[in-house]
Swiss-Prot record:
SUPFAM superfamilies: Putative modulator of DNA gyrase, PmbA/TldD (SSF111283). GO terms for biological process: proteolysis. GO terms for molecular function: metallopeptidase activity. Probable metalloprotease. This is Metalloprotease MTH_856. GO terms for cellular component: cytosol. Its EC number is 3.4.-.-.
């Protein structure tokens, strides 16, 4: 479906004298997915969708309406105006400079040009490779997404974007009759099928299965305070969940963030610099956010000091800050403050230097989920795989290890930042919405961390 931007512009012109601000997002998307479990194809899906949403600001309140029929957009505009009611709200967005632009993610192999049989073969190869001896169940999930969208607002912006993403997720379950363990790997990014072709899928699958089997023989988890090292995946999960969400300005305005009132304060050690950046190559990349704000790097923490927050136009105005380009949503949802690619900036230490003076510690790799209370600033994460560190050397494997504590205390106990870097892929949920994100960083050393079992 071609998006008629002239028609969308005429809808805005019809209502601009009746509202303080208005914008329209229109988009089309195509997705395909494959799910294989234990050697059998469970799902092979493909679909298309399109939609139009209009948002108006009137009397300090938002009105919002959505339709999948372009001919009803004028009707939806009136519905959105009516939703604002007669009572005065406190929402303002300030004035923004209009943007006129066309952007697209370039791909040498758009997923829609790749035969379904080739995608199934990729999934089958990954599944077969992960099914090593000792693995009793394997699941492989493939997904690709292609979308085109247009954004127009009453300030004169007209932005057209095309985005493409692909991802592959692998899970293996191993059992020895007395217990079970799990292995998980993923790959993908913003771009076409060529991203997965560059990966050694069989090696990725084999490592997934071998991890699960290896954990069956691991020792029980230690418990207490230890010096630890986290790998790039767990570093990224911690930064995303514990710091990134707390830096979302809507949570701060709701009184649900440990970072409330801390701008300009030192909240971490000198070596900690945390960045959210939708312009780098990652699963959470984009050129403009859902409010037409150009994407840009946001340095949240610089050398331990909280320097910025993630903002929408509304939250930025309320806090006296600049919009950061972090209002995100699907076409049919109200934009809310979200992360993009969030990571801890690498330092200059090698892995050997990070562990060399740890006499009795733990090396934590990967993530098996966890939980965070952004208001209280406490967290608990489960590592996918762990090892003892003895006298500066990696020693025996241990399983079911958890990391918990206070977010700010833990950030202040970071005293070594590795020179390596890896950015993972995933989907982040908030307020019933899901967006693609990247998170990562280097290996990191944390002193006196609380470690226990899951």
């Amino acid at each position: 479906m071609e998006i008629d931007t002239d028609y969308l512009g005429s809808i805005l012109m019809d209502i601009e004298d009746r509202v303080e601000y208005a914008d329209i997002r229109a988009g089309t998307s195509r997705t395909s997915s494959i799910l294989m479990k234990d050697g059998k194809l469970q799902e092979v899906k493909s679909g298309r969708a399109s939609g139009f949403r209009i948002r108006v600001l009137r009397n300090g309140s938002w009105g919002f309406a959505f339709t999948d029929e372009p001919s009803r957009l004028g009707e939806m505009a009136l519905k959105a105006i009516k939703m604002t009611g007669s009572l005065r709200g406190d929402v303002q967005v300030g004035s923004g400079a209009p943007s006129v632009d066309k952007t697209m993610v370039r791909s040498s192999r758009p997923p829609s040009d790749v035969p379904a049989a080739e995608k199934r073969e990729l999934v089958s190869d990954a599944h077969h490779a992960a099914s090593v001896d000792g693995v009793v169940s394997t699941t492989v999930s493939y997904v690709d997404m292609e979308s085109s969208s247009a954004f127009l607002n009453s300030e004169g912006s007209l932005i057209e974007m095309a985005e493409t993403r692909v991802a592959l997720f692998l899970n293996a379950v191993a059992s020895d009759g007395s217990g079970i363990q799990f292995g998980h790997k993923s790959c993908g990014g913003t771009g076409g099928f060529e991203i997965l072709e560059r990966e050694d899928i069989e090696e990725l699958g084999r490592r997934t299965g071998e991890k699960a089997v290896r954990l069956l023989k691991a020792s029980p988890p230690p418990s207490g305070r230890f010096d630890i090292v986290t790998d790039p995946e767990l570093t990224g999960v911690f930064i995303h969940e514990a710091l990134g969400h707390a830096a979302e300005a809507d949570l701060i305005l709701q009184g649900d963030s440990i970072l409330e009132g801390k701008l300009g304060e030192k909240i971490a050690s000198e070596g900690v610099t945390i960045i959210d950046d939708p312009t780098i190559d990652g699963f959470g990349s984009y050129s403009y956010d859902a409010e037409g704000v150009r994407a840009a790097e946001t340095v949240l923490v610089e050398n331990g000091v909280l320097t910025s927050l993630l903002n929408s136009r509304e939250t930025a105005f309320k806090l006296g800050l600049e919009p950061s380009g972090n209002a995100r949503s699907a076409i049919g949802d109200q934009p809310i403050v979200r992360m993009s690619n969030t990571y801890l900036k690498p330092g200059d230490l090698s892995f050997d230097e990070l562990i060399e003076d740890i006499r009795n510690g733990v090396y934590l790799r990967g993530s098996r989920g966890g939980q965070v209370d952004t208001g209280k600033g406490i967290f608990q994460f489960n590592a996918a795989e762990s090892f003892r560190i003895q006298d500066g050397e990696i020693a025996e494997p241990v399983k079911d290890v958890s990391l918990s504590g206070n977010v700010l205390e833990t950030l202040k106990n970071v005293d070594g930042v590795g020179s390596d870097f890896r950015l993972g892929i995933g989907f982040c949920g908030k307020s019933g919405q899901s967006v693609p994100v990247g998170d990562g960083g280097p290996h990191v050393r944390i002193r006196n961390a609380m470690v226990g079992g899951t």
